[in-house]
């Protein structure tokens, strides 16, 4: 009887599909809340709502910045386009604070 050679079996770990972890703003929202008031917390449902809201605002800013880049026939999305998009998407007072915080964050990261 001739012996049959079987193909080596792959490990079961190789067959498992890997899901990307869902990115969320939960950590940053809870840190901001603790910085404001250390005794407060958020329920899971509230955190999902805030996370959804932040994702929506970020997506709107990204879409607006991309349309600005296309309108100016450029290939690179820079800080200036993002600033313009923030001014267009957010209400004036909130945009002013966002611009100040964004400028501060960029200057701190460039040190």
From Swiss-Prot:
UniProt KW Nucleus keyword: yes
InterPro entries xref list: Histone-fold (IPR009072), Histone_H2A/H2B/H3 (IPR007125), Histone_H2B (IPR000558), HISTONE_H2B_site (IPR055333)
Primary location group: nucleus
UniProt keyword DNA-binding present: yes
Cystine pairings recorded for this chain: none
Compositionally biased spans, kind Basic residues: 12-23
GO cellular component: nucleosome; nucleus
Domain of life of the native organism: Eukaryota
Keyword tags: Chromosome, DNA-binding, Nucleosome core, Nucleus
Entry's localization field: Nucleus; Chromosome
One Pfam family named in its UniProt record: Histone
Database matches in PROSITE patterns: HISTONE_H2B
Stretches the record annotates as Disordered: 1-24
Family recorded in the similarity comment: Belongs to the histone H2B family.
Function: Core component of nucleosome. Nucleosomes wrap and compact DNA into chromatin, limiting DNA accessibility to the cellular machineries which require DNA as a template. Histones thereby play a central role in transcription regulation, DNA repair, DNA replication and chromosomal stability. DNA accessibility is regulated via a complex set of post-translational modifications of histones, also called histone code, and nucleosome remodeling.
Assembly and interaction partners: The nucleosome is a histone octamer containing two molecules each of H2A, H2B, H3 and H4 assembled in one H3-H4 heterotetramer and two H2A-H2B heterodimers. The octamer wraps approximately 147 bp of DNA.
Protein name: Histone H2B
């Amino acid at each position: 009887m001739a012996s049959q050679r079987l193909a080596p079996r792959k490990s079961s770990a190789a067959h498992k599909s890997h899901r990307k972890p869902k990115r969320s703003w939960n950590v940053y929202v809870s840190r901001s809340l603790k910085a404001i008031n250390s005794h407060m917390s958020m329920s899971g449902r509230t955190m999902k709502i805030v996370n959804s809201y932040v994702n929506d605002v970020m997506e709107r800013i990204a879409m607006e910045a991309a349309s600005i880049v296309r309108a100016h026939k450029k290939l690179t999305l820079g800080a200036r386009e993002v600033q313009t998009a923030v001014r267009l998407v957010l209400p004036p007072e909130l945009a002013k604070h966002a611009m100040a915080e964004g400028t501060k964050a960029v200057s701190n990261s460039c040190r």
